[in-house]
């Protein structure tokens, strides 16, 4: 019930007791923090009361700096000066071209997290955005005859989605952006899986797409419906 939820430390304590341990005998969250501070050098002089008095503290907060440290490394690092390594710019694996003239990147919205499995269960958060959206610059939208919140299709060499356009100057000309929280229009069905040669990370943040307005009166279909029709 609201107001009666248990803190993480209480669940951890209950689990420990079920396993036969009596070591986690905290009475409240402050006791947990005190234990953390006792074994963490950077937190040694911290306490709930000092945090409340100072509206927070910057670590390290220890015997040498009991009021916290405004700048962590002002002269050097514990192991000496930082080692700066040069990097060479490598262009994206799949740039926009005549067939797919816009560059797509993916983004997150502050209303949702990850695939939305938790945040989309909240009616308050869910009402803030439509289930899927593509951010597009006014210049590109005008060139493509796309209206604000108009129904559109987005296609790459790997996938096809239907969603709605959000016209905004937040994205530059030539770039479109799509959040990845929505199962109705999962943007990562469009993205490129080309890998970085060193880290093997896929290049999910850049690919070429073709954006078109849907026929008048046609609503965007969720990907589940598109898959059934294919």
Q: What would you call each of these model-derived segments?
A:
Residues 1-54, 115, 121-135, 139-230:
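Long, contiguous, secondary-structure-rich segments that constitute the structural scaffold
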Residues 28-124:
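Long, low-complexity segments enriched in small/aliphatic residues
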